[in-house]
Regions:
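Short acidic/polar hinge/loop motifs at secondary-structure boundaries
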Residues: 209-237
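Face-selective signature of the C-terminal outer-membrane beta-barrel domain
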Residues: 345-361, 387-543, 616-617, 660
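Conserved C-terminal beta-signal and adjacent last beta-strands/turns
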Residues: 89, 285, 291, 296, ...
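Short, acidic, small-residue-rich periplasmic hinge/interaction motif at the N-terminus
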Residues: 118-159, 617
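Gram-negative outer-membrane beta-barrel transporters
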Residues: 522-528, 612-615, 619-623, 636-726
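Periplasmic-side early beta-strands and strand-to-turn transitions of outer-membrane beta-barrels
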Residues: 262, 271, 287-383
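Membrane-embedded beta-barrel scaffold of Gram-negative outer-membrane proteins
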Residues: 404-412, 418, 558, 564-566, ...
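Extracytoplasmic beta-strand/coil segments of soluble accessory domains associated
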Residues: 150, 168-209, 213
Length: 802
């Protein structure tokens, strides 16, 4: 069968030139895309022709004589063609031998023209390499040597969940110990049972650049992150302030984007799903001369699922008063302004440039006191009810080798805007307090802030007799300032009051300095000590300065692939956010302390080769102090939580079948002044146990055709909530009544089917919540509602790679 190599090569060269001219400016068109030797041009032309007509032995004979002399892309091209010839001759062993040599030449080799069976060999050989990460120690190391338990989520694992998943759902599926929590329009996460009003206990990064804002330390785990751009997600399960400082309390999530060399083309993808959902992605990448360029753009919009009391379960009756017909709960609605993610990375020799802009606009599921009618409310500054967050980021880095010392310098900036447009509920039929407050009132709050910073890091390797190791040290500075704010009040859905007085003047600034050091010492090739220490000082506005010392100590033993042991002690902190400290200062509370986590973890991991099984088991003890919770009329910084737990992960891969399972269990040892039920010994809103199972099966795999079936199941144990009710007394005082409510355990199934042709065209059908099970999330406040999750929904998608 003939293969149209020449047409593809011509198209790719045009694409390479177009991207390079656009992003790098004018570049001589006669420059070669790679370091190949044009003297082999005639040899390759003849070899391609012989391969197309089945003269495989002639191709092998011709290339065998020259491949040893080749370098760069010429050698890669020869090795690829030789492997394809052996594969066509059904000599799989020889094909794998040359494919292995090809990967040694280029770890990121990828070619959309390859037959599917050859792509399978390449992917399998790639997977055989030990995964290296940089998130845990800021240096390249294997997962086995990382000083903390690590979860790696690959692009394939993300695809196996379907196209309509947000970041929080992906993390909750693959990371044991992580669970979604929710507060009306904010996608939040808990780790080992700890959470806060903003997603401030887990540090989220993109290529090492912090995404959590500095106003309230939060970052929503929603659709403002394109999943199609992701190469992998590295998750550190445990405290990491010794390297990253503030916010890295219970976990670190580092999103690693694809490289231009890996994609080497243009990919376009579109999906349409239930509830008026549209999702689109475009990714472009290439390597031109010494520059690696990757560009992405993503768009998400959805009307969301509309729920009413009559089509819900008995849970709704536990939380809401009667309401007018035509008003809804809006579940996962993203509309009014598009939710998008655009950005690019450029690497040129030692330089790296990152630029991105992310926007999220999510509808509140409920109004202030229950169901509401989104369409009745007027726009304010072109914004409708819901929560919006816009972030623009820019970073420039430079790496250089100065003798034995590696230097890394970076400067960066983040410009952040939050909008909170809260709508009241519909008019009620009764005479409760809510009726007086629910006459189409609304509240609009906008804040803008800016962060500028820089860092300098140096590292070097050393030897001490038969021992060796690596040390690094660094310094970081940040300047944060609130630059603008606006508060408005409205009534009657469309009426607008004059600009309201600011409850607090947030237009102030703060500076912070951080100094850190780390040593990784190999006593033996199999015995490693990893120690780190970071000192942070924050010059806080109108409050005492705060300092934090964050240590980490890890002892790692890696005797063989079947067994690796890891014992880790670490401490981390989250300073109370600028927003909440400033708000509480106005009511006389200026004694907020940093939130702390001290953790002890014992991990066992390894591979059981005969069973094709990998495993990871982690036993942890956590001691949280000074946790922050929102109370009904104020805030509390005195929360204490101590718990023990177990995490376990197992993965299996053989031929066309891949499967993974993870499980989590925790037990509260002590809890005070926190979201905790003493009678049930349970943390409110989070499960005691979860189990996830994910399976992928290639039903068909033949040359250019592949048909894959994938599915997942998630078991979540029951959760307890603290229901709060307000009763208006005859003298207009308010009586607050609280009671505990149980949400039943659930089992949610997803399934999908994907067809791929020639590694270019992909068609997929995804079904989320296959059994249409009612399930709910709850959030970090004493106004604990049972927030709906989506019911059964379908999405069809198509993608094409040029």
């Amino acid at each position: 069968m003939k293969r149209p190599f020449r047409i593809t090569i011509i198209a790719r060269r045009w694409l390479t030139c177009l991207l390079a001219l656009t992003l790098l400016g004018a570049t001589p068109l006669q420059a070669q895309e790679n370091s190949g030797n044009s003297n082999y041009r005639l040899l390759f032309e003849q070899a391609d022709e012989d391969y197309e007509i089945g003269r495989f032995n002639q191709v092998l004979a011709a290339l065998e004589k020259q491949v040893g002399k080749m370098t760069g892309s010429d050698k890669q091209r020869a090795l690829r063609l030789m492997a394809l010839c052996y594969l066509a001759m059904y000599e799989t062993g020889k094909a794998e031998e040359y494919a292995q040599k090809l990967i040694l030449e280029n770890r990121y080799y990828s070619n959309v023209d390859d037959p599917i069976d050859f792509t399978e060999i390449i992917n399998r050989l790639k997977a055989g390499y030990t995964t290296t990460i940089t998130t845990a120690s800021s240096i390249k190391e294997s997962v086995e040597e990382a000083p903390a338990p690590v979860t790696i989520i690959t692009a394939e694992m993300i695809e196996n969940l379907g196209y309509n998943k947000r970041l929080g759902q992906i993390l909750a599926t693959y990371v044991p110990g992580m669970s979604e929590v929710y507060e009306n329009e904010t996608d939040n996460m808990s780790m080992h049972g700890a959470y806060s009003s903003a997603q401030e206990l887990i540090l989220v990064m993109e290529n090492g650049h912090r995404l959590n804002n500095r106003l309230d330390n939060g970052y929503a785990m929603d659709y403002s992150i394109s999943t199609d751009k992701i190469d992998r997600i590295e998750v550190l399960r445990g405290p990491a302030s010794s390297l990253y400082g503030n916010v890295a309390l219970s976990a670190v999530v580092n999103i690693i984007t694809k490289s231009g060399r890996e994609l080497n083309g243009v990919k376009m993808k579109y999906g349409h799903g239930a509830f008026g959902t549209h999702r689109a992605d475009i990714t472009m990448g290439t390597r031109f001369m010494d520059a690696d360029i990757f560009v992405w753009g993503a768009l998400y919009q959805s009307d969301g699922q509309h729920r009413e009391a009559r089509d819900s379960t008995e849970y709704s009756k536990k939380f809401f008063f009667p309401h007018e017909t035509g008003h809804h709960a809006y579940i996962d609605g993203y509309k009014g302004k598009p939710t998008y993610d655009i950005g690019m990375t450029l690497k040129y020799k030692g330089f790296s440039l990152m630029a991105s802009r992310k926007n999220s606009k999510k509808l509140a599921q409920y109004g202030t006191f229950g169901y509401y009618d989104y369409d009745k409310y007027r726009p304010v500054n072109n914004t409708y009810p819901g929560s919006g967050e816009l972030t623009s980021s820019l970073g420039l880095g430079y790496n250089m080798q100065l003798g034995p010392v590696a230097l890394n310098a970076s400067v960066y900036g983040d410009w952040h805007e939050t909008i909170q447009y809260d709508a009241s509920s519909a008019e009620y039929n009764d005479t409760t307090m809510q009726k007086e407050l629910a006459d189409g009132c609304f509240y609009y709050d906008k804040n803008e802030d800016r962060t500028l910073g820089g860092s300098l890091q140096a590292s070097t390797a050393y030897k001490a007799g038969s021992m060796q190791g690596n040390v690094l040290a660094g310094v970081q500075f940040e300047h944060f300032a609130v630059t603008d704010l606006l508060t408005l009040f409205g009534y009657g859905y469309t009426g607008m009051a004059e600009e309201g007085d600011q409850l607090v003047d947030l237009k102030h600034h703060e500076n912070s300095w951080s100094f850190y050091a780390q040593a990784k010492h190999h006593f033996l090739p199999t015995l490693i000590l990893n120690a780190g220490l970071r000192y942070d000082i924050r010059y806080r506005f109108a409050m005492d300065n705060v300092t934090n010392l964050s240590p980490r100590l890890a002892l790692i033993y890696t005797p063989r692939d079947e067994l690796n042991l890891k014992l880790t002690y670490s401490q981390a902190f989250v300073d109370m956010s600028f927003k909440y400290r400033t708000l509480m200062r106005e009511i006389g509370n200026d004694k907020f302390q940093s939130q702390y986590l001290t953790a002890l973890q014992l991990s066992v991991m390894g591979k059981i080769a005969p069973l094709r099984l990998s495993y990871d088991v982690n036993l942890f003890y956590n001691q949280f102090e000074n946790l922050h919770i929102e109370q009904i009329y104020s805030m509390n910084n005195e929360g204490v939580l101590r718990n023990i737990g177990l995490e376990a992960t197992a993965t299996y891969s053989h031929n066309r079948l891949t499967a993974s399972m993870n499980a989590y269990w925790n037990k509260v040892v002590k809890a005070e002044n926190y979201f905790y039920s003493e009678t049930e010994n349970a943390i409110y809103a989070v499960p005691k146990a979860t189990v996830n199972l994910n399976v992928g099966w290639k039903l068909l795999q033949h040359r250019k055709h592949e048909l894959k079936l994938y599915g997942s199941g998630r078991y979540t144990s029951s959760k307890w909530l603290l229901k709060t009710e307000f009763v208006l007394l005859p003298n207009f005082d308010i009586d607050v009544i609280t009671s505990e409510t149980r949400l039943s355990d659930t089992f949610i199934m997803d399934a999908g089917l994907k067809y791929t042709y020639a590694n270019r065209l992909t068609l997929a059908l995804d079904c989320e919540n296959l059994l249409d099970t009612d399930h709910f999330l709850a959030g970090p406040s004493y106004y604990m509602y049972a927030y709906h999750e989506r019911g059964r929904n379908l999405m069809v998608s198509a993608s094409y790679t040029f």
